[in-house]
Amino acid sequence: GIYAAYSAAREGADVILLENDDNIGGMHVQGNVQGYYYGAKGGTYEEDDKMCFSNDVYIGKGTFPFLKQSLYTKRLSDIGVNLLCGYTPTGVVFDEIRAIGLCALDGEKIINIGAKMIVDATSDGHIIRMTNVPKKYGREIDGKTVPFTVRTQFMKDGIYVAVNTDSGFLNQYDAREFSKK
């Protein structure tokens, strides 16, 4: 989502980035994913990771979520992206044949946003799931959903440390199975 917003704004589009949480960034920021495009070289994410590793403000070195959030928020604001944090998409507005806007709720009020284009960069396609487009969940080979990882963050010897712990496969749409992990 952050890279789609940044790229569109860089090309001159008026961009609104809706974020459900209080901070921007999904898997790349909050999930602290490093490396994209199956290891291909190049891309804005590489510039950002280098920028994070060169920081001298935060405890520890690396691409920590809170560092990414502050750097990316500044980058997007500087290029003119309108950041709306704390909003949940509640509906898609259609004309005869295409999506032309979104409705979103911030907990108190509903806003309506007209759009020439909508990019659904949510974790599980939350916006597309509001439409009547046929959907299919899980992998083609076995119907299983994606692996789930728990990211633990702590201080060790005065240094901020983050560890990914693979929790195995689970069905994130099953509340009982999800809550056991």
Residue ranges of model-derived segments:
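Solvent-exposed loop/turn segments at secondary-structure junctions
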Residues: G1, D22-I24, Q34-Y36, T90-G91, ...
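N-terminal Rossmann-like FAD-binding beta1-loop-alpha1 element of flavoenzymes
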Residues: G1-I16
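Residue-level detector of anion-binding/catalytic polar loops
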Residues: D14-V15, N23, N82, P134
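Conserved N-terminal glycine-rich FAD pyrophosphate-binding loop of Rossmann-like flavoproteins
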Residues: D21-E46
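Flavin (FAD/FMN)-binding glycine-rich loop and adjacent Rossmann-like elements that form
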Residues: M27, D48, G101, L105, ...
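Feature captures the FAD/FMN-dependent oxidoreductase FAD-binding
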Residues: D56-M130
